[in-house]
Amino acid sequence: MAITRNRRLIKRFLAQIEKQIRPLDYKKWEKIDPSLKIKLQPAGHILGSAYVECQLQGPRSKSKGKKRDTRIVFSGDLGATYSPLLAAPRSPYRSDVLVLESTYGERLHQGRRDRRKSLARVINRAVENRGVVLIPAFSIGRTQELLYEIEELLHREKIEDIEVIVDSPLAAKFTAIYRRLKKYWDREAKRKLRKGRHPLAFDQLHQTDTTQTHRYSTGTRGCRGEGLACRSDQGSAGHQ
């Protein structure tokens, strides 16, 4: 927490927050008080992210005798339409007032197909040259999306002589949480599971789950920081 480094206070604050948290399902109205109800919708940013629809009941109309309501939508980051693992965010049916995070709103991003091609090109070159690909990545969201796309590439092109190392204890913890929450994955990811594939737990994947292991790994690679490393297996003869 940014407000203090006092471990005792942090523990107390977190305990209080935990008492106040109420998990809600997506797409169901929840009454907060007689004049307000809310509904969560998938935001497609990270697993579990949501935007909030708030319906405020106003005063009764004098002409029609009906109560007028106002729909307000709040959202933080919104994900792309075809992000790996995540259901695509859908626009709300109605919004009278929209409050939206827009840090990268004016930028055009590569489509998923182009990103896949770029990733495949870099990893295949590393396999051919017996090299290493280092990918800095956020511990939550981006790491899991990359693992999903890398597993697809290894499966499609039958690449076996490669190690994929997630060199971040925090990312390893978030990846384990993603695996536990499979029911919130999108249909494409669930189809892979039914076929016996494991997009976040494939054979070539290795994760550092302690700080000590992370320090050893960065020392042996001669680099600092956290992220993913795709390393060609020097003991193999080549991919099929």
Mark where each language-model region is:
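Acidic/His-rich, metal-assisted hydrolase cores and their charged scaffolds
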Residues: M1-R71, S75-Q240
